[in-house]
Amino acid sequence: MSLTVYNTRTRKKEPFVPVNPQSIKMYVCGPTVYNLVHIGNARPVVVFDVLFRVLKTLYPEVVYARNITDIDDKIMKAAKENGESISALTARFTEAYIEDMAALHNLPPSIAPKATAHIEPMIAMVAALVEKGHAYEADGHVLFDVQSMKNYGKLSNRALEDMLDGARVEVADYKRYAGDFVLWKPSADDEPGWASPWGRGRPGWHLECSAMIETHLGNTIDIHGGGRDLIFPHHENELAQSECAHGGEEYVRYWMHNGYVNIDGEKMSKSLGNFRTVRDLLQQYHGETIRFALLSAQYRSELDFSVSLLDQSKAGLDTLYGALKNAPATSTDAVDLSDNAGYLALLDDLNTPQVIAELHRLAKIVNKNEGQEAAIAAAQLQALGGLLGLLQQEPEAWFKATTSGSSELSAEDIEQLIVERKDAKLAKNYARADEIRKELTEKGIALEDSASGTSWKRI
């Protein structure tokens, strides 16, 4: 029983063989905190959270780092436009990011390093690259010389000339070659900056992740994840500067990248007006529903995110929680998933659609059986769901939960109406009792009367 992952570097699925089986090292690029994160930013967080959970079932220790980029030209621009300090802006959006990712049921990473706390190792890495002949100073900048690395482009599988077409490559007269990228840039007096051998300045975009990985995880890590849009130039340049700084030592053993998120069949963009922040979505949908939607496609595929998908995800979770609600009391502590089709699908490059299919199969077993067979299936259902970050609420709480921006009736209001309905029935005022049931139904509340009383759920 072993994990297989698709390696962007080799462009094929490979058995996962860690550098050190006693301690797995994984890094995922986090947000640049100048605004609220959108649903596309959330996909890699959810995907690699699932991988984090799976790895923890296989290895004694998994160290997962996901950074916060808190120094960047976009941050400086946003702070200036908002009339607030950079530290205030980044603190505000870092907090919002942490809250939003927690609302999507993501585990916190082992480490959440911030770029500004790693300026010294960044400067040290630049100095090493200059000393080894892989970087040069020009016009107050320090640039990486891409032609000094003979296999530059091995991650994105591009020739040097091809990389300049349509990529985020800054054109500047001071570069020896157009593809050279900035490691360190000068800062004006009114811009944030740090003292360095090349003058007061700040780090380039790519340098930050390399320095944080070196500091917390070492020169070689097992897995580096992120969105497909980061393959070039960001991850290509990360790889180049890290391997050249460390004498050619392998930087990352497995590169993993998730596909894009489209909105209603179109690329998500502010210009199209289909830009959806996680915070906006949480006003309308439970975080677990959004998470389920993000896992409905295999992570390397493009995901068409839509209201229809969210509604299907809500219905799917209703079905699964409904099975758990009616299941015999059980514990997931001693559940063995080693031969379960869903767990094996997770080990096969995180095939989450197959896992979801297995969850529904287990739910059917729970619904059609009683006693021990139903209890075993329910325990497997909850344990397997847990590896996806799903089905960890009490079923009763799921059916009664409201969204953060909801104008729905509160649980207290509903309970009060149920008491009023009960009193009306006792007083033989059946018209009022029926009126209350109708009122609740119209507001999406289903009542279920039984010998033990009246229960309710949102529909």
UniProtKB/Swiss-Prot annotation:
Transmembrane segments: none annotated. A motif ('KMSKS' region) lies at residues 267-271. The keyword Protein biosynthesis applies. Its EC number is 6.1.1.16. Its cofactor is Zn(2+). Monomer. This is Cysteine--tRNA ligase. Zn(2+) binds at C29, C209, H234, E238. It comes from Saccharophagus degradans (strain 2-40 / ATCC 43961 / DSM 17024). GO terms for cellular component: cytosol. It is an enzyme of class 6 (ligase). InterPro entries: Cys-tRNA-ligase, Cys-tRNA-synt_Ia_DALR, Cys-tRNA/MSH_ligase, Rossmann-like_a/b/a_fold, tRNA-synt_1_cat_dom, tRNAsynth_Ia_anticodon-bd. GO terms for biological process: cysteinyl-tRNA aminoacylation. PANTHER family: CYSTEINE--TRNA LIGASE, CYTOPLASMIC (PTHR10890:SF3), CYSTEINYL-TRNA SYNTHETASE (PTHR10890). Keywords: Aminoacyl-tRNA synthetase, ATP-binding, Cytoplasm, Ligase, Metal-binding, Nucleotide-binding, Protein biosynthesis, Zinc. It catalyses: tRNA(Cys) + L-cysteine + ATP = L-cysteinyl-tRNA(Cys) + AMP + diphosphate.
